[in-house]
Amino acid sequence: MGRGRVELKMIENKINRQVTFAKRRKRLLKKAYELSVLCDAEVALIIFSNRGKLYEFCSSTSMLKTLEKYQKCNFGSPESTIISRETQSSQQEYLKLKNRVEALQRSQRNLLGEDLGPLGSKELEQLERQLDSSLRQIRSTRTQFMLDQLADLQRREQMLCEANKTLKRRFEESSQANQQQVWDPSNTHAVGYGRQPAQHHGEAFYHPLECEPTLQIGYHSDITMATATASTVNNYMPPGWLGQISGSYE
């Protein structure tokens, strides 16, 4: 009689389980080797026991090359996998941005009063509240801008007033210093306005004509006027001028 069919379930007895694992592992490795030799196939077999011990068989020279070949056939190359993931992510991002742009364009048209037909009552009320909020924000921004400009102008005005006061104070101090310098009697270089120093050497320029009283009757009137003029401007005519005038009339 042949063997009965073995029920496929885990063997409860640990010893029997280990014996069965060793027998079947050897037969499996033998079958893998026979398959690779008889059919000229590239066979790779990896077995881990329940304790984590590794058993392997590879018909090629390197197990890693066989595994890379397996990965390329099933999952493609790592680079192509990364590129495909990036492409898929970029496509999803593009679709999100496209939907966002369409929503913004539709909202912009609604704010401009266009394409309001498909909107319902609630959507129109929401649009109205949005417009009111935008107007309040715009007015608040404009008011703040005007207040900032006003404050800036006030600061400039204050700076100009301070500069004007400083210049005025300097001008007054300079004027007072000049007046004190002009009217100070101890300053020998100062000269008063509208005053000339007295000339005590007028006699050096004035030489009266020496003539007989009886001879003055026959003099011309021009000589008399020249003499009177010389007496009036006694401090400004040099001595030689009178002699030239009298000689011209003689």
From Swiss-Prot:
Annotated source species: Aranda deborah (Orchid)
Cleaved signal peptide residues: none
Any single Pfam family the record assigns to this protein: K-box
Gene Ontology cellular-component annotations: nucleus
Any coiled-coil regions, as ranges: none
Swiss-Prot/TrEMBL keywords: DNA-binding, Nucleus, Transcription, Transcription regulation
Record's protein name: Agamous-like MADS-box protein AGL9 homolog
Cystines in this chain: none
Gene Ontology molecular-function annotations: DNA-binding transcription factor activity; protein dimerization activity; RNA polymerase II transcription regulatory region sequence-specific DNA binding
Protein's job: Probable transcription factor active in inflorescence development and floral organogenesis.
Entry's Gene Ontology BP terms: positive regulation of transcription by RNA polymerase II
Domain K-box: 87-177
Compartments, as annotated in UniProt: Nucleus
Superkingdom per UniProt: Eukaryota
Domain MADS-box: 3-57
Tissue specificity note: Expressed in petals and weakly in sepals but not in the column (gynostemium).
Location, primary (coarse class): nucleus
Upper taxonomic lineage: Eukaryota, Viridiplantae, Streptophyta, Embryophyta, Tracheophyta
